Amino acid sequence: MNISGLIIGLGNPGREYDRTRHNFGFMFIDALLEEAQRNPFARCEQLSGGKKKYDLWRCDIVEGQAPWLLAKPQTFMNLSGEAVLAIASFYRVKPAAMVVAHDELDLPLGRMRFKMGGGNAGHNGLKSITQCLGTPDFHRLRLGIGKPPAGGETTGWVLGRFSQSDTAMVDAVLEAAIQGIRTFATEGDVAATQYINAFRP
């Protein structure tokens, strides 16, 4: 199968986690799928759903380019690497051709960062992927969620839902992130990093 790469959105499966901050990666994959389905020239098909480890689609992200695989691990966050390794092994995707979208406490809502490699910054999904792949050398799309208010507890914050007042900001970030991934697909790391890191809502 000819593919351009693999985009993974991190999150937890189940309705109780829908639109929580920790599921920002899932929301990004959903936004990519919705965008592809609105484009009459884009092909998008589900390759697996309801499997134990992952939901997977093959979609056109850029016209005239080989499709990308879009994945939502269904293993829960701390075991995300098991799903990523299973996909990478079956479809022969190298870590350098992967982008992992995830929530980022160290960035405020409305800000993003794109980078290749690096540490896990305490993110268990990234830690699992690094361990399973045996390398940290994959791209990360860090989607800011901000830190809890003073005295707030981190777990409750990341597992809490975005507020109604956050909706416009979240939508703007997702729209810009899609353009950022298209820039990565067509122009590479440097252009994507410049676009994504400079984004202001």
Swiss-Prot record:
Q: Mind telling me which residues the site (Stabilizes the basic form of H active site to accept a proton) is annotated on?
A: D103
EC no. given is 3.1.1.29
| The keyword Electron transport belongs to this UniProt entry's keyword annotation | no
UniProt GO MF annotations: peptidyl-tRNA hydrolase activity; tRNA binding
Provide the site residues for: Discriminates between blocked and unblocked aminoacyl-tRNA: N12
Superkingdom as given in the UniProt entry: Bacteria
| Record's catalysed reaction(s) | an N-acyl-L-alpha-aminoacyl-tRNA + H2O = an N-acyl-L-amino acid + a tRNA + H(+)
Matching CDD domains, A to Z? PTH (cd00462)
Is Lipoprotein one of the keywords? no
Main EC class the enzyme belongs to: hydrolase
Q: Where in the cell is it found?
A: Cytoplasm
* Pfam families named in the record: Pept_tRNA_hydro (PF01195)
Q: How does it assemble?
A: Monomer.
Q: Please give the name of this protein.
A: Peptidyl-tRNA hydrolase
The organism of origin for this protein: Nitratidesulfovibrio vulgaris (strain ATCC 29579 / DSM 644 / CCUG 34227 / NCIMB 8303 / VKM B-1760 / Hildenborough) (Desulfovibrio vulgaris)
Which gene is transcribed and translated to give this protein? pth
